[in-house]
A protein has these predicted regions:
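Hydrophobic transmembrane alpha-helices and their helix-loop junctions in integral membrane proteins
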Residues: 1-229
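Cytoplasmic/organellar membrane-interface segments at the starts of transmembrane helices
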Residues: 159-167, 220-272
Length: 272
């Protein structure tokens, strides 16, 4: 009962279904605050508390694992469905955070069934997601600063006018989708591999892992759609009239792009 209550509290802190409502509203905060909130601060507290509770609890009843993986799957699918109507880039990223944290809860839930690999992947994903989501939110903020809009339908031809922002957009989108060689690929792979290991003796877990793989592919397709719309081609009217990208922003983007690419193997080796 205590672990289930800890899990319930963790859902609230990490904006999982049914306690997700506060997070999309928080994206109205200034972009640096949103990047900190979604990347490294409040939303990560819940998953860290639950992970620590699992480590400290010893033998964890399987019911805790079942509740964790089932709610994670519901949240994962809900987060993806909420991608579809979004046109505001920051609001899309808010629902992306909800879905990405569900991967972490899924991996932690799998660890209850004996998968250390899934646990390691979940912990790695906390770090890897931080770099990718911080980059994506700061890219969105740069569009608001230079273009006066972050509405995706108005963003076309970004690479031609803002090559660094365009590359950052593409790298962050691929990272959120878990595409190699981006950092999140390595942590998602650990979670999925751990899930298949557990699923070898449990058909229900195997089905849930297959659904996770399908959701990951669908997420990639959705972000690929917006990459194909926003990045190539001639700049739209809003992009063509945009102000120059400040050098300080460009420097931060370059650093984060590098970290998104190299932090995956580093976090995996650090976790061991």
């Amino acid at each position: 009962i205590v672990l289930l209550l800890v899990l319930f509290a963790a859902w609230a802190k990490s904006a999982q279904v049914p306690m997700y409502m506060w997070l999309p509203s928080a994206m109205e905060a200034p972009t640096p605050v949103s990047a900190y909130l979604h990347g490294a601060s409040m939303v990560k507290v819940g998953v860290c508390v639950f992970a620590r509770a699992l480590v400290s609890a010893g033998d964890v009843p399987e019911i805790v694992g079942w509740v964790a993986v089932i709610d994670a799957m519901v949240t994962m699918l809900f987060g993806f469905l909420m991608y579809l109507p979004q046109k505001d880039m920051k609001r899309l990223l808010a629902f992306s955070t909800i879905a990405q944290l569900s991967y972490v809860f899924f991996g932690l839930g799998l660890s209850v069934f004996g998968s250390q690999l899934a646990f390691d992947g979940a912990v790695c994903h906390i770090f890897n997601h931080a770099f990718a989501k911080t980059l994506f939110f700061l890219i969105a903020g740069s569009f608001s600063f230079t273009l006066g809009t972050r509405m995706l339908p108005k963003l076309r031809g970004i690479v031609k006018k803002y090559p660094i922002s365009g590359v950052g957009f593409g790298v962050a989108a691929l990272a959120i989708a878990g595409v190699p060689p981006m950092n999140t690929f390595f942590s998602k792979f650990q979670i999925i591999a751990g899930g298949f290991s557990v699923g070898a003796g449990n058909v229900a877990i195997l089905v849930l892992v297959c659904i996770m793989v399908a959701e990951t592919v669908a997420t990639f397709a959705w972000f690929l759609k917006w990459m194909g719309y926003c990045l190539p081609g001639e700049p739209s009217e809003e992009v063509a009239a945009g102000a120059p990208l400040p050098k300080a922003m460009a420097f931060v983007f370059i650093v984060l792009i590098i970290m998104v690419i190299v932090s995956g193997p580093l976090s995996a080796s650090w976790i061991g």
